[in-house]
Amino acid sequence: MMVQSIQIVLPVALFFLIVFNGFTVEGSKKEAQLYRDLLTNYSYLVRPVRNPKKALTVTMKVFIQQVLLVDAKHQMIEVNAWLKYIWTDFRLRWNPLDYENITSVRFQGEDQIWQPDILLYNRYIEDEQESFDITYKTNAVAYSDGVINWIPPGIFKLSCKMDITLFPFDEQICFMKFGSWTYHGFALDLRLDVVKGQEPSADLSTYITNGEWHLLSAPARREEKFYKCCKEPYPTVKFYLHLRRRTFYYVFNVVLPTLLVSFMSLLAFCLPATDLSEKIGLQTTILLSVCFFLTILSEMTPTTSEAVPLLGVFFSALTFIVAMSTTFTILVLNIRYRQITNHYLSPMFRSIFLECLPWLMMMKRPDHKFRRGSSYRDSSADQCVQCAKNAELKSILRGTDNQQQIETNTFYPFPTETLSLNRKVGDGLFIQRRCQIHEEARSEKFTHGMLACEKSLRENGSELANILVTILKMYEVMVSQVERIRKRIALKRKRKDIQDEWKFAAQAVDRFCLIIFTIVFIICCFIFVAIPPIKILD
């Protein structure tokens, strides 16, 4: 049963195979006959025009597929695009009815039919061995009415003059310039393929977006150029590429880290002036970080002196700010660690850094109030200093004779003085200069008084007077020792107070630098954001 079925199916299959093969051979014969008829006496070197004095019209359109690369450093753009050329060849017309309704045929390149020698004028060539024409040689489609449609694809590398002034918020406008290499405008009229009612432009219907650039538009324009040597026009077609850089990558990976690092330089002024190594180490590390980002930026931008990118100017400004902040930090530490033994606190320095600057910076100190151009100590916290009190030396020993009393005032009147003092910063924030002067005057007067009293007692010559002289000598020794201790304590207090004044001056300069550099930093950031004509984030 199986054998009988095979014997029936095989003849039927063989019959249909022979019939369809005959149709195919007949169709191929018609197409081959059409090729022979069209190419008989055809020369691909001759322009397809009946009148040699008339120009052949060639329309052109570009289909942008993708922007592959925008290399600002080498001033080059790489684009994947299709080119579409349409022209009419009167020698390639036929009646489809004579050739089994064949309406179109394909010709392989310029070796069979005439093709326009249109090239990309602004072609970018990296290697000397590269061909100037980089389009893929596809077949040209010829229709029965003589219309030729040729669509060669290619990856085009074109030179583009880029302006990186607003980098990374820049927009670039590049163009693809096409034109005939040998034909002038009277022989080949190159025109744009424009849809009626629309502006001439490249086709973006199949465009694939780029991760770094926005393709905003691709307008087209036809131009004619005349040269001094010739009267014929030379038409060209330009397809512009209006590109805008996507800024999120640069803002997130370059700008924001640099801003944060630079902002940390302001925090160095908030560190105590006693942290010598920490302040200098922090400022130096920040300076190196900004220089590192500046090195990364230099690798992104072209090596040109025509324009400096905005981001480069911003980084340079930040580098300058950090460098100056480091310098002023060193100045603050220099003021902080000055001593009375090697530096003199001049009146002008006092007036500027201990009076005016703290008042401007609205600084506060315990027991002191700052006013414009001066500083004084709060009187509620001061105590009246009494430099001397009334002293009387009365009778120490009383004899049996109650009429005999010795009063010190009979020997010598001791000086008495009362002084109320309001200390001023101009006389020293922490040094009781006036009190010290009055204490020294009081001590000198008291010494003279004791000497005069001793002299009077010696002249008296009584036993009681001799005892009193001995007591006065012992008291004089104690007074001299106490005076020596007082002077030593006063010297230590003086040194400490002057050192505290240097510390306070360093704090005032530190506060001043913090405010100034903060203002400069904010201004730089505002200018960086305000100058670009586009938004920071897309």
Curated annotation (Swiss-Prot):
It is a multi-pass membrane protein. PROSITE patterns: NEUROTR_ION_CHANNEL. Disulfide bonds join C160-C174, C229-C230. It is found in: Postsynaptic cell membrane; Cell membrane. Residues 334-513 are cytoplasmic. Residues 28-250 are extracellular. The keyword Transport applies. Glycans are attached at N41, N101. The keyword Nuclease does not apply. Residues 1-27 form the signal peptide. GO terms for molecular function: excitatory extracellular ligand-gated monoatomic ion channel activity; transmembrane signaling receptor activity; transmitter-gated monoatomic ion channel activity involved in regulation of postsynaptic membrane potential. It holds the Pfam family Neur_chan_LBD. Keywords: Cell membrane, Disulfide bond, Glycoprotein, Ion channel, Ion transport, Ligand-gated ion channel, Membrane, Postsynaptic cell membrane, Receptor, Signal, Synapse, Transmembrane, Transmembrane helix, Transport. GO terms for biological process: chemical synaptic transmission; monoatomic ion transmembrane transport; regulation of membrane potential. GO terms for cellular component: acetylcholine-gated channel complex; neuron projection; plasma membrane; postsynaptic membrane; synapse. The chain crosses the membrane at residues 251-271, 280-300, 313-333, 514-534. It comes from the Eukaryota. PANTHER family: NEUROTRANSMITTER GATED ION CHANNEL. Belongs to the ligand-gated ion channel (TC 1.A.9) family. Acetylcholine receptor (TC 1.A.9.1) subfamily. Forms a homooligomeric channel blocked by alpha-bungarotoxin. The structure is probably pentameric. After binding acetylcholine, the AChR responds by an extensive change in conformation that affects all subunits and leads to opening of an ion-conducting channel across the plasma membrane. This is Acetylcholine receptor subunit alpha-type acr-7. It comes from Caenorhabditis elegans.
